[in-house]
Amino acid sequence: FGEDTSWVKPVLQEKSDLDSLLLDPNNKWFARLNSATRYMVQHIAPYRIPLGRGYYSPLDLAWALRGEAIYTDFYEDPEFVHRLLEFSMKATIWFARAQAAEIFAPGFVHELSAWHCGPNRIALGEDISSLCSPSHYREFGAPYTQQVFDAFGIGEIHCHSAGPHVVPEFLKLKRARQIQIVA
C-alpha cells in the first residue's frame, strides 16, 4: 500500500504497541479529515444542509486498532483491553471535539448543523457490540461509551440488526437519546 492509503490491517499487532499510540493534531490523516470537513461545511452551509457525522464507539475503535485478536484478549488479558479502551475513549472524544469545531465554525453554523453531532451531542457506532455477549458489552463497551456520552451530554447509538441481544445494555446507558438499528 502507498503512503496515501489508510490502514487496512490492525495497528496493534503486539500489545506493547499500545504505548506508542498518540493523539497527534499534526497526524496527516487527522489533518486531512479536518480539512475535508472544513471544505464540506463551507460549501454546504449556504444551502442549510446538515452535515451528519458519527464516530466509532471506544469498543469499535479498539477493534479497529486490535482486530479480531480483541476477542481472545477479552479472556486472556482483560486488563490490556481496558487500557486499550481507555485510549480509544480519549481518542473518540478528542477526534469528535475537533470535528465539532469544524462543523460549528463561526460563519457557517446554522440551525440544522447539529443533526447528529455537535458540542453537546454525539452519535457512536456500536457495530462490534453485535459480536459480543451482553456481559462482554457490559464490561468492555458500556463503561467507555457512557464516558463519551457524559463528555458530550447526549448520545446516539448506531448498531446492526445482528445485535438485538445487546439492546437491553444500550437502554441502561444514561444520556442515550436514540438507538438506530440497521440491517
Q: Across the structure, where does each feature detected by a protein language model lie?
A:
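Active-site loop segments of alpha/beta catalytic cores
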Residues: 2-4, 22-183
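A contiguous, low-structure linker/loop signature
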Residues: 1-19
